[in-house]
């Protein structure tokens, strides 16, 4: 057995848009609280992720290299468990998903038009640098 502090899932972290209306959500509430421009990264955690989830969320927001928002991954939120963190949650391990919200933002997601030209490398790099800062502090 190896002790696991937590799992960090990177899901679709390279597509950004400052255009209003570029970000959609599964609930109207999130549109009101998070806005309609897809220009941020999202940290998804659950209360069961405990201190790891709290630390990841707070440190990502505090790092300040890229706008960061958070949401608790309630099962009723469509798509909240559609990535590699799902099985960690299933077996009781703390896990967070760092995402740009995939198909809620990127209309190219899993299509032929999902090409390297659609990646915002400046902001993708900011996400990676921010994660590097956060992981070093955990």
Segments (PLM) and residue ranges:
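A glycine-rich helix N-cap at a beta->alpha junction
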Residues: 1-16
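Active-site-adjacent substrate-binding region
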Residues: 19-21, 25-138
């Amino acid at each position: 057995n190896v002790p696991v502090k937590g799992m960090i899932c990177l899901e679709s972290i390279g597509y950004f848009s400052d255009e209003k209306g570029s970000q959609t959500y599964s609930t109207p509430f999130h549109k009101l609280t998070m806005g309609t421009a897809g220009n941020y990264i999202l940290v998804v955690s659950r209360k069961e992720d405990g201190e790891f989830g709290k630390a990841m969320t707070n440190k990502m927001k505090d790092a300040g290299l890229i706008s960061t928002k958070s949401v608790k991954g309630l099962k009723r939120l469509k798509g909240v468990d559609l990535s590699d963190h799902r099985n960690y949650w299933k077996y009781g391990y703390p896990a967070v998903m760092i995402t740009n919200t995939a198909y809620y933002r990127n209309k190219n997601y899993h299509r032929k038009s999902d090409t390297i030209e659609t990646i915002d490398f400046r902001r993708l790099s900011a996400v990676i640098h921010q994660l590097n800062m956060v992981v070093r502090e955990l």
